[in-house]
């Protein structure tokens, strides 16, 4: 599967880089979505799926072989 990041998700990732360990965990979780787009702990929220990674939530959309990272939020 192919993973792309929205502009908002990219900007948020950069903004949260003060927490490098947290963003590395987010990046690993996002890369793992290519192998398993519905991992244990991912919740469906409307047209999107939400994955919790430590204090962060990753909102993403699966469309065929394309995964779009829509947004990253801090809890």
Please report, for each region that a protein language model flagged, where it lies by residue.
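Enriched for short, Lys/Arg-rich terminal
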Residues: 2-3, 14-15, 20-23, 53-57, ...
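Basic, amphipathic "hinge/linker" alpha-helix immediately C-terminal to the N-terminal HTH DNA-binding motif
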Residues: 5-9
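A short, surface-exposed loop/turn module that caps and links secondary-structure elements
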Residues: 27-52
């Amino acid at each position: 599967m192919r993973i792309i990041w929205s502009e908002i998700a990219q900007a948020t990732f950069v903004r949260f880089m003060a927490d490098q360990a947290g963003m590395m965990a987010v990046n690993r979780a996002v890369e793992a979505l290519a192998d398993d787009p519905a991992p244990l702990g991912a919740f469906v929220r409307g047209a999107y799926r939400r994955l919790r990674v430590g204090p962060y939530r990753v909102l993403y959309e699966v469309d065929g072989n394309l995964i779009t990272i829509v947004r990253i939020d801090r809890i």
